[in-house]
Design a protein with these regions (language model features):
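Short, hydrophobic alpha-helical packing/hinge segments within bilobed ligand-binding/sensory domains
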Residues: 68-69, 92, 209-210, 227-228
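Early extracytoplasmic/lumenal segment of secretory-pathway proteins
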Residues: 30-93
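Bacterial N-terminal signal peptides that target proteins for export
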Residues: 2-16
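Cleavable N-terminal signal peptides
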Residues: 18, 27-28
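C-terminal lobe and pocket-closing loops
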Residues: 216-229
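Short amphipathic alpha-helical coupling segments at ligand-binding clamshell hinges
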Residues: 46, 189-190, 224
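Extracytoplasmic ligand-binding site segments that recognize negatively charged/polar headgroups
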Residues: 37, 41, 63, 80-218
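N-terminal signal peptide c-region/cleavage motif recognized by signal peptidases
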Residues: 23-25
């Protein structure tokens, strides 16, 4: 954790890592083609165990989520992809709307993944969850004054909040969750208030928001948990 920065972790789990089977043609050839936006060693370990247990080789195609989804659209029915592995339910919604996914029936998936973490039509399933949280300077912010996203709209935080652009999928998913929880009108009012409270124009990555707090540019930031530590 960045020294001098505290974190609110009990807000809401919103950034889901998701996977969905696209086809089965490669399985017949003892090869599984995975289009992956992820870059974690844990995935490599999982893939190796799968190959050791089944004898099926895994071919991983790397790229950003948007690039991979666009590739699936371009390839159409001729796509060699079997699985799309990416982050955030918002991106999986885009993939579903683009028509590049198909439903899967699996008792194992149904048994291990709750309905709240999978598509209603079983076109994608959540593997892990992470939180989009509020971080703040322990020296400049009293934790008793800040415990929810709604608190960020208070005018006392004017000129003190750092956040990346609203064009980022993580913030779009956050906004979607607030619309679901509070309604569109209240969520829009909240967003306008937070904008007025920004310490600077939105820029950079989640890590840049944490750096802004650590350097004193801002007192509060919104970011994903896995960037902390």
């Amino acid at each position: 954790m960045i020294e001098g920065v505290s974190i609110i972790t009990h807000l809401f789990l919103r950034a889901t890592l998701l996977v969905f089977c696209l086809s089965t043609s490669s399985l017949l050839q003892a090869q599984l083609n995975i289009y992956s936006h992820r870059h974690y060693d844990s995935d490599k370990i999982l893939f190796k165990k799968f190959t050791d247990q089944t004898g099926i080789e895994i071919n991983v195609v790397k790229g950003s989520a948007d690039q991979l989804i666009q590739r699936l659209i371009s390839e159409g029915e001729n796509s060699p992809a079997d699985i799309l592995l990416t982050v955030d339910a918002g991106r999986l919604h885009r993939a579903k709307e683009a028509g590049v996914l198909q439903p899967i029936r699996s008792r194992t998936l149904y048994r291990n993944i709750p309905a709240s973490l999978r598509d209603p039509d079983n076109q994608w399933f959540g593997l892990t969850v992470r939180a989009r949280v509020i971080v703040f300077s322990k020296d400049r912010v009293d934790s008793n004054e800040l415990s929810t996203y709604e608190d960020l709209a208070n005018s006392k935080w004017k000129g003190r909040i750092a956040v990346r652009s609203s064009s980022n999928i993580y913030n779009q998913s956050l906004m979607a969750s607030l619309i679901e929880a509070n309604g569109k009108r209240k969520a829009l009012s909240w967003a306008k208030s937070v904008r007025k409270n920004m310490a600077r124009a939105p820029r950079g990555s989640d890590r840049d928001q944490a750096r802004a707090v650590a350097s004193g540019i801002a007192d509060i930031a919104i970011m994903n948990t896995y960037y902390i530590g």
